A protein has these predicted regions:
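Glycine/small-residue-rich loop that forms an oxyanion/phosphate-binding "nest" at active or ligand-binding sites
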Residues: 1
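Conserved, helical-rich catalytic subdomain that frames metal- and/or nucleotide-binding sites
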Residues: 4-96, 111-146
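Short glycine/threonine-rich catalytic loop with a Thr-x-Gly-x-Asp
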Residues: 95-104
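Short hydrophobic/aromatic beta-strand micro-patches
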Residues: 107-109
Length: 146
């Protein structure tokens, strides 16, 4: 979401309202779309949601240190999301596998397109997804600079 609001890859603090530009390594992603719709309001209202997470600061932020507090609650309430995420975590060559935002999509990051495509070819027939290249900034920024 930050790239659409801010125009660049961004590190979000607070509840996502404090954005700072961050340089990330080039990456490819496999995104899985579980066959459920997660209610963001339901997840944020959940008593199981961790509300006292210590903030991560930049620097020395590492993408591997981050986490999504909503992920555990969504996976508990929506087994389809948990199944997709667990499948991604078992793949070779992933740097991370996480849930996107409040769900239901989950993703795995790969260093190369070839690694992402090999993983995608293993996708079970009962799962839906796609492969996408990570962007450093929103493509409309290029048009604005022409």
């Amino acid at each position: 979401v930050p790239v659409f609001i801010f125009g660049h890859n961004a590190f979000a603090e607070g509840i996502g309202e404090q954005l700072a530009v961050i340089e990330l390594p080039a990456a490819w992603y496999m995104v899985l779309v579980p066959p459920v719709q997660v209610s963001t309001a339901e997840i944020f209202a959940s008593k199981e949601l961790t509300r006292n997470t210590l903030p991560i600061k930049i620097p020395p932020f590492s993408v591997w240190q981050g986490h999504n507090d909503l992920e555990a609650v969504v996976c508990q309430r929506y087994p389809e999301v948990a199944r997709c995420l667990e499948w991604l975590k078992r793949l070779e060559h992933t740097t991370i596998a996480r849930m996107s935002g409040s769900g239901s999509c989950v993703f795995a990051e790969f260093a190369t397109e070839a690694e992402a495509q090999v993983a995608f070819e293993q996708l079970p027939s009962n799962m839906k997804g796609f492969v996408a290249k990570g962007l450093h900034h929103h493509p409309l920024r290029d048009l604005m600079n022409e």
